[in-house]
């Protein structure tokens, strides 16, 4: 097992290859990651949508959702939230800030496209009609809840999520 210092050194060295990767390769890996995270989200909704106890439903969803992140880490796909950690290599002058920004934009757009692609496939597959439409209603309820968060709450939740994703990426380094 690597020490934290060794894990950081490994990750920083790996970032050099990431930022220099051709845009089309980054984009394809990012589409894949977006789909995998969407699989995790869809799986957590399927697992939790028909559980009456809110606490248990959230626990089940919380256990299933990280499967998407595990797929991303194991396949080497590119996820925006984890790639934000590449700023460590920028600070150490392993690459320029411009290269980091280019990578983050390409990965963000690829993640968005991948998640939208999987959402469309889920819709066409009829998945949202499961349980007499209860899964679709649950999905809408979750989406509305997230859309109605005030800016500060959404930002704080996003930061906390990013900390957890970066921790997972470092553990995998």
Regions flagged by a language model, labelled:
Residues 1-173:
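Alpha-helical transmembrane segments and their helix-helix packing motifs
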């Amino acid at each position: 097992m690597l020490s934290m210092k060794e894990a950081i050194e490994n990750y920083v060295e790996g970032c050099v290859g990431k930022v220099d990767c051709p845009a089309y390769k980054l984009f394809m890996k990012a589409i894949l990651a977006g789909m995998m995270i969407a699989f995790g989200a869809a799986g957590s909704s399927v697992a939790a949508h028909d559980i009456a106890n809110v606490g248990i439903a959230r626990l089940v969803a919380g256990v299933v959702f990280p499967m998407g992140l595990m797929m991303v880490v194991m396949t080497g796909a590119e996820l925006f939230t984890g790639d934000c950690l590449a700023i460590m290599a920028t600070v150490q002058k392993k690459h320029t800030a411009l290269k980091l920004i280019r990578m983050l934009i390409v990965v963000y757009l690829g993640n968005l496209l991948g998640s939208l692609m999987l959402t469309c496939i889920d819709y066409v597959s009829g998945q949202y009609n499961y349980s007499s439409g209860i899964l679709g209603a649950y999905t809408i309820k979750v989406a509305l809840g997230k859309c109605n968060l005030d800016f500060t709450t959404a930002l704080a939740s996003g930061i906390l999520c990013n900390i957890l994703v970066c921790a997972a990426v470092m553990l995998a380094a």
